[in-house]
């Protein structure tokens, strides 16, 4: 099971976070293990927005192992140091939850491959999205729970896709939740309903 929803506002912006939450909540009977949003927000396009995690939500139903929260701070310090070493500057930093962060980064690059590989080589760290307008937010629980946890009802943008998941092929964790960032491309996200064999 699982469910996918998407919306596009042509030539205008709207409250895509709230709208997609309503659509995904209507699909909760298709799966409530995790829910993910790929939101394309209104930005000035100057800085990269990087959503990443330094740990897993180990709430009810999670297949992840509990970690000491202090390890999240250590991982964040290494991420910050790596970003600085690559000549980038963290312009804005938000820590939504102990394991979930959002950075705006001033970084002159067209190739995100080396950047993302260096960040993701840090044990326990995963980039959920990177781009000038894309933000992938995903976590355990149904659409309303995730929307409330991350205040997505305030996000204004032009389009969005989302996924309500019932885990059948992998664990109940953030890493396995959809949508996925189209690594290493800026502002690309994908969601699907089945296994993809390459």
Predicted features along the sequence, with ranges:
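Conserved small/polar residues in nucleotide/adenosyl-binding loops
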Residues: 196-198
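N-terminal glutamine amidotransferase
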Residues: 1-193
């Amino acid at each position: 099971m699982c469910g996918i929803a998407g919306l596009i506002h042509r030539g205008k912006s709207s409250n895509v976070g709230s709208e997609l939450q309503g659509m995904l909540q209507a699909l909760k009977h298709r799966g409530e293990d995790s829910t993910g949003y790929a939101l394309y927000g209104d930005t000035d396009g100057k800085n990269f927005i990087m959503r990443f995690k330094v740990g897993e939500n180990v709430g009810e139903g999670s297949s992840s192992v509990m970690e000491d929260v202090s390890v999240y701070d250590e991982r964040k310090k290494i991420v910050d140091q790596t970003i600085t070493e690559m000549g980038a500057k963290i312009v804005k930093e938000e820590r939504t939850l102990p394991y979930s962060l959002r950075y705006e980064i001033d970084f002159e690059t067209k190739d995100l491959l080396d950047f993302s590989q260096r960040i993701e080589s840090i044990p326990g760290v995963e980039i959920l999205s990177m781009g000038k307008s894309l933000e992938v937010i995903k976590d355990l629980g149904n659409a309303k729970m995730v929307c409330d946890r991350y205040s997505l009802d305030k996000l204004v943008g032009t389009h969005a896709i989302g996924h309500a998941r019932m885990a059948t092929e992998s664990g109940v964790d953030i890493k396995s939740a959809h949508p996925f960032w189209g690594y290493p491309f800026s502002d690309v996200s994908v969601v699907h309903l089945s296994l993809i064999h390459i």
